[in-house]
Amino acid sequence: MKKIFAVAALLALSLPFRVAGQDPSAQLKDFTRLLQVADGLQLSIVHLNDKTVPVLFQPPTLYSIRAHAKEATMFYVQGMPQKDVNLDTSGFSVQQGGESFPSTPLNISHFEKGKVSKGDRIDGLLQLAKHIDVSKPFTVLHGKDSVEFKFSEDQVKAMTAPPAK
């Protein structure tokens, strides 16, 4: 767990990262969903995989996050409240095929239980204890709010880097 918190600290230093000559939002679009978690707060939830991690992170954080994302399903969470809100990060879970998987929130910036002021950027990670099957639809839940992820065959293929030659 200490390693994950060290990763989160390194992560704060590496954001935001831009790939030269490429539009990061276009690269993340297929793997991002918007979740309304409170009046005045919408969070971008990005599925972390071989396609999204290099867009969001730079070395050495990139290598650590990619390794963790290969061990268990992870999401990058970002948002900015339009007014003061109370955020409860303990309420995130994922459902797939009738099973519910709790998540562990990792704070990078303002992604912890409590008050978040208008305009404060929220950054964090959600980590599941295991991998879910990304070839099947799944839902990220926060209390009564939810958003569905359903990836195409091509998107699932893009999530895994080709083997090294």
Q: Which role does the model predict for each range below?
A:
Residues G21-K165:
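Conserved functional micro-motifs across diverse proteins
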